[in-house]
Structures are given as C-alpha cells and as structure tokens.
C-alpha cells in the first residue's frame, strides 16, 4: 500500500483541510451538472423550492421523454450528499421520477437555478467538535 498524501478529491467530493477543520464540497460537480443541463447563463433562484409547495402526480402534462428528468434528479440525489440545503426539494422531486410532468420539470429547473447562484456551498466539519450524535 502506498501513501498518496493528504486527501483532496474522492468520488467527486473535494476535501479541503483547514486549520480548524475540513470542508467538503462538490462545486466542480455542481458546475459540471449545470453545464450538462445548459443552465450556465440563466438567472438564479433565491431558494431551492417555493414555500408550502404541494406537488401532485396529476399536475401538468406528462413529459414525452422522462429520461432527462430522471437523470437530473439522480444527479441531484448525489449532490445532496454535501448539499443538505437541497435535500428536501430533491426528496419531493424524486417522488415523480416514474411519471414526471411539465410542472415537476419546472420545479427541477428551479433547483438547478438555485444551485447556479450557490455553487460553492459546502459542509464544514470542525476539528474541535465531537462527531457523536
């Protein structure tokens, strides 16, 4: 076994060692996701989801090809590992992967616009705090 030095990047997660703790980020993954979805030059959203939003399976018209919706939701599920601020929105949107509609897709785009405005958000684990629950 070979020591490769300090950990900087693992499974798409960027790890930065700071004097007072560790920062875990997926900024590169976020920017790549935005580029793949074609949302690099759009306006941003202040929140990932509207307050008190109630989505139903019957909202909107069915998407002709739901694979793009499924792919983007899957990418957001992985991104939520280091972005708990989107986890609720991703949870709601993932309920409709079997039959997404135009309304669901519009709300998915809102999450992506939110990420466009906050690509550098990350988790911070302090060296001084206990990791016990």
Give the label of every model feature segment.
Residues 1-133:
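Long, low-complexity, charge-biased intrinsically disordered regions
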């Amino acid at each position: 076994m070979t020591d490769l030095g300090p950990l900087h990047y693992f499974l798409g997660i960027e790890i930065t060692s700071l004097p007072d703790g560790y920062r875990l980020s997926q900024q590169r993954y976020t920017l790549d996701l935005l580029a793949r979805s074609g949302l690099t030059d759009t306006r941003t959203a202040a929140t990932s989801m509207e307050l008190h939003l109630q989505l139903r399976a019957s909202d909107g018209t069915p998407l002709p090809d739901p694979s793009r919706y499924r792919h983007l939701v899957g990418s957001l599920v992985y991104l939520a590992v280091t972005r708990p601020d989107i986890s609720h929105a991703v949870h709601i949107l993932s309920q409709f992967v079997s039959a997404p509609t135009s309304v669901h897709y519009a709300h998915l785009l809102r999450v992506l616009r939110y990420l466009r405005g906050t690509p550098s958000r990350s988790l911070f684990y302090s060296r001084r705090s206990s990791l016990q629950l």
